[in-house]
Amino acid sequence: MKMRYAITYGKMKEFKNSDETKKEYAKYKEAAEKAGLKLLLWGSPFGVAESSVVVIDFGGDMDKFVKFFSAQSGPWTDSRTDFVLEY
């Protein structure tokens, strides 16, 4: 088994409207794809303090994920990440 997915929670930045929100997440998805990652899902989580969640498939390459996440800011602040094993 190896780590494969990252679930990142954060406080969504202030955007003017839903179109701007979609645009920012689309830019983040494009940047992830250029780094060899896949942004699978994004949305609003339930039952946690954060207002944003993304699920990223990094294909088991933790170094690739850490490099991307360290260099690229997302449309959120105050993030935390859980990693999920591929079974």
Predicted features along the sequence, with ranges:
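Short S/T/G/P-rich N-terminal loop/turn motif that feeds into the first structured element of a domain
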Residues: M1-S51, D57-K67, F83-Y87
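A common structural junction motif
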Residues: S70-D78
